[in-house]
């Protein structure tokens, strides 16, 4: 089997694994706040389960990178899938016991699983070179398109399957998804890496030096902005929808449209990046996120919520995939593990904070305030991105 064939095989496997693994977050996001409302006596804590999911994602990135480095991606990913199965069982147990604490432990554990799933996009680039990196990332993210349908539909199909424990069935289905991922991940094979004999002991630059690189800082900032703003608005959306008189099914379908929009562009995002460049597509993503806030501020009908969530998802896709591709240009193969791990730790740590503050801010200030905050944060990253593009344009004209 040639390296190219092995790489394509791994992309297919990772895409299927992504479809299964990425079906879990929509369940947590759709129901985390609603279950929080039932189990928590403090309205400010209703989004804590979703925040802990994102915190688990952030805290899990560095251990996941360590396990991948020590035991290989396949073994680490299978461990992650087992953790995902356990997470669903724990969350369901919390609902059965009417325990907010146990339920939160389940969503935190689900975040640990998500930290492995998030790195599938980097695993796809292990044997890719040049422009193929962006396409490899993009194709693995296509698995999320299936997840966009499976996750929310599981919520609708299973939310009342156990009458005395509303939503417990949905989290048990989450456990099944983790178990189904195990045989898929078992087929993953690490690509052969041709090592430079002169670089056997090369560990690359110290992490501190990488973190101080302006290029790395901008790449991480773009990813953080795209993901944190998406999570900030998305976490508040289901609660805001129900609060404005819409049904739980409407809220779940809103998340489904949102997640579909997050992953559907992946069919062509890689090609767009190849044609127009990483920075331009990332900037376009940020503009679309700002546009989603404009739609959200237009009213409280189902159409306003769904329209905002759809453009928020498309903006996330361009911003996140573009920023991920930017990060892969900021490190050598020897620096890959620590650079990618640091990127995800910073990004998902910020995402955890964003999801937590979404709940308290929604309770204290309302849905409009959530969306007004999008504009200054987008501007903070969009301006440096545009300034980075200007010299290239000037050089091209000269």
From Swiss-Prot:
A GO term, aspect molecular function:
transmembrane transporter activity
User: What InterPro entries does the database record attribute to this sequence?
Assistant: MFS, MFS_dom, MFS_trans_sf
Q: Which UniProt keywords apply?
A: Cell membrane, Membrane, Transmembrane, Transmembrane helix, Transport
According to its UniProt record, where is this protein located?
Cell membrane
The membrane-topology field of this record reads: Multi-pass membrane protein
UniProt-listed Pfam families: MFS_1
What transmembrane ranges does the database entry give? 13-35, 45-67, 74-91, 95-117, 137-156, 166-188, 220-242, 252-274, 281-300, 305-324, 345-367, 372-389
Task: Describe the function of this protein.
Answer: Transports riboflavin into the cell.
Which species does this protein come from? Brucella anthropi (strain ATCC 49188 / DSM 6882 / CCUG 24695 / JCM 21032 / LMG 3331 / NBRC 15819 / NCTC 12168 / Alc 37) (Ochrobactrum anthropi)
* Coarse class of the protein's main subcellular location: membrane
Name the GO cellular-component terms: plasma membrane
Q: Which PANTHER family match?
A: MAJOR FACILITATOR SUPERFAMILY PROTEIN, MFS PERMEASE
Q: Which family does it belong to?
A: Belongs to the major facilitator superfamily.
Provide the protein name: Riboflavin transporter RfnT
The protein's superkingdom reads Bacteria
């Amino acid at each position: 089997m040639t390296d190219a064939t092995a790489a394509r095989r791994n992309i297919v496997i990772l895409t299927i694994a992504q479809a299964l693994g990425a079906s879990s977050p929509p369940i947590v996001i759709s129901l985390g706040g609603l279950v929080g409302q039932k189990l928590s006596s403090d309205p400010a804590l209703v989004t804590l389960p979703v925040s802990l999911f994102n915190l688990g994602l952030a805290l899990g990135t560095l251990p996941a990178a360590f396990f991948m480095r020590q035991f290989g991606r396949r073994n680490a990913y299978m461990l992650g899938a087992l953790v995902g199965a356990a997470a669903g069982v724990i969350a369901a147990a919390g609902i059965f016991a009417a325990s907010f604490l146990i339920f939160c432990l389940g969503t935190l554990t689900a975040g640990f699983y998500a930290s492995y799933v998030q790195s599938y996009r980097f695993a796809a680039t292990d044997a890719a070179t040049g422009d193929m990196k962006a396409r490899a990332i993009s194709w693995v993210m296509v698995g999320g398109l299936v997840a966009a349908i499976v996750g929310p539909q599981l919520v609708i199909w299973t939310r009342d399957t156990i009458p005395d424990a509303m939503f417990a069935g949905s989290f048990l289905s989450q456990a099944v998804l983790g178990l189904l991922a195990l045989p898929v991940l078992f087929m993953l094979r690490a690509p052969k890496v041709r090592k430079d004999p002169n670089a056997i002991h090369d560990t690359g630059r110290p992490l501190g030096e990488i973190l101080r690189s302006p290029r790395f800082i901008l790449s991480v900032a773009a990813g953080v902005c795209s993901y944190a703003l998406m999570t900030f608005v998305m976490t508040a959306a289901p609660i805001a929808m129900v609060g404005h008189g819409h049904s739980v099914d409407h809220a779940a379908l809103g998340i489904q449209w949102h997640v579909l929009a997050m992953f559907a562009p992946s069919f062509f995002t890689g090609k767009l990046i190849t044609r127009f460049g990483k920075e331009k597509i990332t900037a376009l993503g940020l503009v679309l996120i700002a546009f989603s806030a404009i739609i959200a501020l237009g009213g409280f009908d189902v159409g306003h919520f769904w329209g905002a969530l759809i453009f928020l998802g498309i903006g996330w896709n361009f911003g996140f995939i573009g920023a991920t591709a930017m990060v892969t240009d900021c490190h050598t193969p020897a620096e890959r593990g620590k650079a990618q791990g640091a990127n995800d730790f910073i990004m998902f740590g910020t995402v955890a904070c964003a999801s937590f503050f979404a709940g308290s801010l929604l309770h204290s200030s309302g849905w409009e305030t959530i969306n007004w905050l999008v504009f200054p944060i987008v501007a903070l990253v969009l301006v440096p991105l545009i300034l980075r593009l200007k010299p290239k344009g000037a050089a091209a004209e000269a």
